[in-house]
Amino acid sequence: TYAQNASHLSMISGYGVTEIYDNGEQKYGALNSIGGWFDITKKEQLKKGYLTWCWFWGYTKNLGCNDDIVGPIYMRGEKNMDRMWRVAPSVLYTHNAMSIGIELDATTVAYGTPDSRYKVSDTHNVTNFRICTMLKYNF
């Protein structure tokens, strides 16, 4: 997905002031971003119940503004985020009304120094790992 000012889509995006006129009015420019995700799911029948294997991958990148930002900027996420990706494999075992699952999640965000168009360079990665478990009984 390519979008402008797509913070409502949970993308690294927003808008900023690109011109300030003598009468106090302001012109705004949108931040551009690109992102997407991919999810594969496979269900495997067992003698008792079944396994569901899932693999999720997502990516989003800040492409900056088409014009220089000369005033305040309003955006989703930190103003120095360049890109973010997430990988989350999971497995779910279901037997009759009971399900138990586990998901491993690795999320990496590249932070750096924004230029006047809020394109970010000189990045360094920060990674977070999570393990999530689930137990469910349907009745």
Feature-to-residue mapping (PLM):
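Strand-connecting loop/turn motifs
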Residues: 46-52, 93-99, 128
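C-terminal beta-signal and adjacent terminal beta-strands/loops
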Residues: 97, 104-117
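Short beta-strand segments enriched in hydrophobic/aromatic residues
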Residues: 2-4, 44, 59, 95, ...
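Residues on the lipid-exposed face of transmembrane beta-strands in outer-membrane beta-barrel proteins
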Residues: 36-42, 89-93, 102-104, 133-137
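Short proline/glycine-enriched turn/loop segments at secondary-structure junctions
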Residues: 46, 120-124
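Outer-membrane beta-barrel "beta-signal"
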Residues: 125-139
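Surface-exposed coil/turn segments at beta-strand junctions on protein surfaces, enriched
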Residues: 80, 93, 124-126
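Detector for outer-membrane/organellar transmembrane beta-barrel domains
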Residues: 1-81, 85
